[in-house]
């Protein structure tokens, strides 16, 4: 199982990145392309999940993009690293909770290298430091990819 690793240096437009990821999902499903791990930053934008409400926004001057993911709002901006995985779960363990735990443990170990004590919360997905979220995790699966 070969995973292509892509690291974008300049901020990537959120809408364009999602279109590229959706195309890659279809290519992985059809066997045309390898799985992908894409590290990038986005231009400043709020993404609103299915539970988002504009009254929760801290700034009304930032572009808002509605998404089909769960959750409320997430702000993306230059300097904030985002890692997207496009994985074929037919070739891997299909346990999504296990995958999320592996990602959480990876983030905890990276922060530990910088002497930052962090933890995963059983009730709230993500990584936390002193009761404040430092790392968000979102997962979307389409036909096992």
Task: Please tell me what each predicted stretch does.
Residues 1-129:
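N-terminal lobe of the biotin/lipoate ligase/transferase fold
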Residues 132-145:
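Catalytic cores of processing enzymes, dominated by hydrolases/peptidases
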């Amino acid at each position: 199982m070969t995973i292509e690793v892509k690291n974008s240096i300049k901020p990537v437009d959120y809408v364009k990145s999602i279109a590229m990821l959706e195309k890659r999902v279809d290519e992985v499903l059809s066997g045309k392309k390898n799985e992908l791990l894409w590290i990038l930053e986005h231009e400043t934008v709020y993404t609103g999940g299915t539970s988002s409400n504009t009254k929760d926004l801290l700034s009304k001057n930032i572009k808002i993009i509605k998404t089909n993911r769960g959750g409320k709002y997430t702000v993306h901006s230059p300097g904030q690293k985002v890692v997207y995985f496009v994985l074929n779960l037919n070739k891997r363990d299909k346990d999504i909770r296990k995958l999320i735990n592996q990602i959480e443990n990876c983030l905890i170990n990276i922060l530990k290298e910088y002497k930052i004590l962090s933890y995963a919360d059983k009730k709230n997905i993500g990584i936390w430091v002193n009761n404040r979220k430092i790392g968000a995790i979102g997962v979307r699966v389409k036909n096992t990819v």
